[in-house]
Amino acid sequence: MKLFLVRHGETDANRVLGHSVEGPMHNEPVIFKSGDDTNIPLNIVGRGQAEHAGGELPGVIDELYASPLLRVKETAEIIAGTKNIDPKNIQFRAELIEYHQGSLEGLTASEQKERMGVDSRGSGLLCNYNYTPWGGDNWETIYSRLSSFFDELKKHGHDKNIVCITSGGVIRMAYKIFLKDKSPSITKHIMIKNGSIHEFVID
């Protein structure tokens, strides 16, 4: 099975920050956009990135999955269009939804520190797989649900090209799953830009 993980195209939130936001596992401002209140669409650059990604993917896509978040859904629909895939054949899966920080959602690292009274990055708190911010996810849950999803794909995905459109934090977690290493440093230098494609060959 060849598994292609694609990060959604750029949104205005990504552009305003001036860099890709990948989450608490590397040295960037901690701002997540995954909840309903921050479920924002692609901008014109992001739509172009999705179109480009579609052109870079294999000519034959056997199965196309996506997170139901708006920016991911739009990316998936654009990619489907480049491959003449009926958008109705996109399979939306909750397992591919980005990590949600709950009460910390949308805050920079300094704003989180002010709210929590502790440096969420410097303390390693948000890298703790069992820490759950109020109303949010924890990394152990993400790891578990994503592992189960990949196991499901492996059962029927032999000799298939499978594409999953998702978010940066999920792709970073996928690397940890396939490398069998949960340490923050394992993905520190992996770039996961908007519209980027990450290919895994799975026996």
Predicted regions and their residues:
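Domain-level recognition of soluble alpha/beta enzyme cores
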Residues: 30, 140, 181-203
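Short glycine-rich phosphate-binding loop at a beta-alpha junction
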Residues: 61-68, 91, 161-165
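Glycine-rich phosphate-binding loop signature in dinucleotide/nucleotide-binding domains
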Residues: 57-60, 153-160
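Generic beta-sheet signal
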Residues: 3, 158-169
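A polyampholytic, Gly/Pro-enriched intrinsically disordered region
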Residues: 108-121
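Short glycine/proline- and acidic residue-enriched helix-loop micro-motifs
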Residues: 32-38, 120-141
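Active-site-proximal alpha-helix that buttresses catalytic centers in soluble enzyme cores
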Residues: 2-85, 115
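A short, structured active-site edge motif that brings together acidic residues
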Residues: 68, 86-105
